[in-house]
Amino acid sequence: MTRPNNSTLKNVAFYAACFTFSVALFVALAVAGHVYPFGDNSFLTNDLKYQYIDFFAWFRRVLLCEANLRYSFSQGLGMNTWGLYSYYLASPFNLLCVLFPADKLTLFVFTTTALKLGCIHISSAWFLQKRFGLPMPAAFLLSLSFTFCSWTISNLRNPLWIDCLILLPICAYGCHELIRKRRMIRLVIATALNVMFCWYTAYISILFLCIFVLVEFVDYAAEEGFSWKLMLDRALRFAGAIALGLLLSAWTFLPTILAMSKGGPVLALGPLLKTSLKSLIRGFLPCMWVNNESTPQFYCGIIMMLLAVSLLVNRKVSIKTRIATLVVTIILVASSVLSPLEYIWCGMRVPNGFYSRTAFLLSFFALWAAGYALQKLKERPAFRRAHRPAIIMPLLALTAIELFANAHVMWNQLYVGYSEEANSTYVATATDTITAIQDQTSASFYRIDRTTTRVDSAALNEGLALGYNQLSSYSSANNPQAIALLNSLGYSSVGEFSTRYAEPILAVDALLGVKYAIPENAPAGYVLAKTNQTDSESAVYENPYALSIGIAASSDIQNSTLKSENPFEKQNDLYSKILGREVELYTKIEATSTENSDSLQQWSVTVPASSIGYLYINKDATAGSYWPVTLTIDQRTIENEAWRFDNNIRQIADASDAPSQHTVSIGVAEGYTDMPQDNEPVFYALNLDVFKQIMNELKASEFVPTVFKDGRIEGEYTAKDDGNLLLSVPYDEGWNITVNGTAVELTPAADKGLSSLNVQKGANRIVMTYKTPGALAGLAVSLATTVALVAAELYARHKKSRR
């Protein structure tokens, strides 16, 4: 038996110390900030509370075989969830969620964050030792600075991005090995893992490595001499390594690309400059970061930054290397300043929030430059004593205090205003409400939605977490055509990638199978459900008109494009195409303007008898997503309307036997000094007699499935004639369908937000199963690449052994 030598034990102890120190510092931050589990300030902040916590709950259900990894009906109208998995959840750390109860997932997030920080410290310390041969104390100090740089601390709210910081040092050392030793395998494997864990940060990392490898090549060529043959050889090896990494990860990368490439809203490129000179300078200073979307997170420890700068004036370093270092530094700083560069780094898309997403690259490059500078300083006799404990320990203590102070200032801005107790209470109440509905309903298909969320108006993924089918969705990985359809029908702002069910819309709810609503106010057309909920915020209402998953429809709906004047006319057009004749569910109400000023506009509206009155605000083209108004309907006030999450059809009044008079006004929203002057409210009435007649007609030809679960629909449908069956399932190429054992094609409907299939007169046995597009092809590519790499390695070893 081989016993570990002292060097091995020393290394293990060193990396254990790195891990433990980072975890301890992280825990100390939580204690100082009274952050859960050491206080009531929840660790859930920003997108952690809006998105991730529900995604983790869903992933936990997937791992426990309670949900399907490939497809879910719990977001929008349904979606391919491979993009959701690969973008948000592919980190191996997330497998630990099964070890935590459903009501302790905040603790799971906190625990995995601590583990990731410890691993970043280990990875970056390993890189410094391997690349520059730094002694342990110096490697410990610099890697600690990288681990707790401003970018990391501010982006713990985006767990999917953090794994990249573990792999980036390994990728960088792979570049060094490739240039110096012509070895590719480390870079190949690290690139593959990077893509597997999060393709988004992998793209950013690969783009950076294309620049970083040039610096390593310049440094190597400065020592060994330049030749075009050498450059071509290394360029081909680098390109080959990246390509092989992508091929190895094709099992997840290919289906991800297919899932995420369906289009969707694209933000316009903003102003050329993303920040001001003052904010840019603040970004380099400790304790000066401001959570205002304009302060870049460049700070990464004063000692490390000074060492990095010293490399530029160190004459022991080749002038070519120093120039290359300066050029890359300028590019990385400019990437957080200039919109076009940010656009390139973020996948040729304008990022929505979380400014300076690439600042971690500058922090890593500072780590590399500081390590290089220390390597050169170590060669000077005068600096050899600097690595002694008497000198390095005070520097380490000062660095730790400085990093802690900076992180504490940032946490005081990020981890406030949301109580973990309030979060736990809401989840428990919501779970009880949904369970009560599910226990009393035997139907295989129905949808549920609610107008209140866990926090603010953006926690819209509760269906995924609790296992029910909802319309609301807030995710960068969804079915964009379904979201676009929902928003255009009046559920949210047109052009947004999210949908919020802010208020029931009877006619669309019925068509899409929303049988239960949990609203703040009693919705017109609904009846109180028998769920015995005493809490008014959890009162459940039942939609007696809700249709099943499929209905007979005319051929007009196939490959149809709906009119887009406003949501009411769009609904009229949708129902007309379904029925094959012109119908007017909604009629326009003429409103009389009673006041029109820059700060207040008011109308008097008369709702006809036997009709539900609604309004919708067509937004001013200049209003964008973040310029709301205050909407008042009689005595009811909605503080923020016509903005990102609240641009919805709103109920004016329930139906009555006689016409009713109402006052509607829009004014300046709280926190704003003015309002968009060209916001245009439109007023319509839903004719209940026409609506009920249409519902009776559609209910006579419903397809009621016997099996309805994520990724699978089965059932018998009896058609009166050969015709078309409309499904409230978004069109997706991944559906495989048989009717009476014969394969049939799904056809797009309603701007691809719905789908349809042809059926024959009489009995139709329908079976729909979902297979992730690209999954089998990607797996085949990954397996073939793995076999080829193993064969190449075995051949190389065999060839070497014969020499």
Task: Specify the residue positions occupied by each region the protein language model found.
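Signature aromatic-anchored transmembrane alpha helix within multi-pass, membrane-resident enzymes
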Residues: 243, 377-406
